[in-house]
UniProtKB/Swiss-Prot annotation:
The chain crosses the membrane at residues 20-40, 53-73, 88-108, 132-152, 175-195, 307-327, 344-364. It comes from Rattus norvegicus. Glycans are attached at N5, N159. It is a multi-pass membrane protein. This is Histamine H4 receptor. The H4 subclass of histamine receptors could mediate the histamine signals in peripheral tissues. Displays a significant level of constitutive activity (spontaneous activity in the absence of agonist). The lineage of its organism: Eukaryota, Metazoa, Chordata, Craniata, Vertebrata. It is found in: Cell membrane. Interacts with TSPAN4. The keyword Cell membrane applies. Residues 1-19, 74-87, 153-174, 328-343 are extracellular. Keywords: Cell membrane, Disulfide bond, G-protein coupled receptor, Glycoprotein, Membrane, Receptor, Transducer, Transmembrane, Transmembrane helix. InterPro entries: GPCR_Rhodpsn, GPCR_Rhodpsn_7TM, Histamine_H4_rcpt.
Length: 391
């Protein structure tokens, strides 16, 4: 993005500390995201669908630290004139990287939504690498289409005598900035909020069902007047009210000693016999199924929390800049007021590229193990018992 209000020449005592801090930020962004990329390359266990999207986010943030900030430091602090060619390259690259980072967050949130809300179908799908790469490439194409053509077309709008500031030609067109703010911020935030709400709603429903008593079995119905019977499968999640001490008989079904309980409930209204047959297999498997469901709920809650943190960081880092750009677009070029708050809002966008790798990938136990593997550390952290939950 471009800091369109310009910067006065600062004294050397201020330039050196600022240059050091800006360079430190660029270095931290580069190293943090490079670790994520290298961990993904070094550990094959990380190469599943969701981590590919985190890789896409790390790539865009990595080049923010390699290209966007290093080129901007001499321009803003030492009044280095880019020239039209470098200025155009920097504008397109910076807008592309920042927007691709935003759209990668949307793609990550959609993948999280699918893995929690449609867990069975999500795990049953075997998404090929080509489809995953196509989704990653689509993020970059959409990110370029948001600002790239407009930057190229608006270059002729700029005042040819004003070559000191490297900014797109539409910075004074409020309606264009409103559209780009909608595509870069409001729409992505709305989508991530929607996916987050759906995830929490799905987890709440699953948590409510898991607290209900569950009895699986078969219902066999027979008519008193005929010898025919019908057997149907049923999974009943609630107890039947009003049933008192039904007659029961225990019999063996197989040489292995599997037993089943046959409960005959005679109804006096329709003259039918309803039998609930609960097999020992269901009784033996229910603790395992309950434990698996509990693990899935814990995993879903962790994913929901990580997505909420990712959304909060994105909103905090991007909302001030979008608001400032729309407000400042109402001023004519060269008459826009200079504010330290605008500069802070401007740098917050790039700061988001620093915190993104620490919000999920570098806190993920598998990424940490891959990081130790990169450093060739023989003593790796002991795997946690909840590794299956965090993965």
């Amino acid at each position: 993005m471009s800091e369109s209000n310009g910067t006065d020449v600062l004294p050397l005592t201020a330039q050196v500390p600022l240059a050091f801090l800006m360079s430190l930020l660029a270095f931290a962004i580069t190293i943090g995201n490079a670790v994520v990329i290298l961990a993904f390359v070094a550990d094959r266990n990380l190469r599943h669908r969701s981590n590919y999207f985190f890789l896409n986010l790390a790539i865009s943030d990595f080049f923010v630290g390699v290209i966007s900030i290093p080129l901007y430091i001499p321009h803003t602090l030492f009044n280095w004139n880019f020239g039209s060619g470098i200025c155009m390259f920097w504008l397109i690259t910076d807008y592309l990287l920042c927007t691709a980072s935003v759209y990668s967050i949307v793609l990550i949130s959609y993948d999280r939504y699918q893995s929690v809300s449609n867990a069975v179908r999500y795990r049953a799908q075997h998404t090929g690498i080509l489809k995953i790469v196509a989704q990653m490439v689509a993020v970059w194409i959409l990110a370029f289409l948001v600002n790239g053509p407009m930057i190229l077309a608006s270059d002729s709008w700029k005042n040819s005598t004003n070559t000191e500031e490297c900014e797109p030609g539409f910075v004074t067109e409020w309606y264009i900035l409103a559209i780009t703010a909608f595509l870069e911020f409001l729409l992505p935030v709305s989508l991530v909020v929607y996916f987050s709400v759906q995830i929490y709603w799905s987890l709440w429903k699953r948590g409510s069902l898991s607290r209900c008593p569950s009895h699986a079995g078969f219902i066999a119905t027979s008519s008193r007047g005929t010898g025919h019977s019908r057997r149907t499968g049923l999974a009943c999640r609630t107890s039947l009210p009003g049933l008192k001490e039904p007659a029961a008989s225990l019999h063996s079904e197989s040489p292995r000693g599997k037993s089943s309980l046959l409960v005959s409930l005679r109804t006096h209204m329709s003259g039918s016999i309803i039998a609930f047959k609960v097999g020992s297999f269901c009784r033996s498997e229910s603790p395992v199924l309950h434990q698996r469901e509990h693990v899935e709920l814990l995993r879903g809650r962790k994913l929901a929390r990580s997505l909420a943190v990712l959304l909060s960081a994105f909103a905090i880092c991007w909302a001030p800049y979008c608001l400032f750009t729309i407000v400042l677009s109402t001023y004519r070029r060269g008459e826009r007021p200079k504010s330290i708050w605008y500069s802070i809002a401007f740098w917050l966008q790039w700061f988001n590229s620093l915190i993104n790798p620490f919000l999920y990938p570098l806190c993920h136990r598998r990424f940490q193990k891959a990081f130790w593997k990169i450093l060739c550390v023989t003593k790796q952290p002991a795997p946690s018992q909840t590794q299956s939950v965090s993965s």
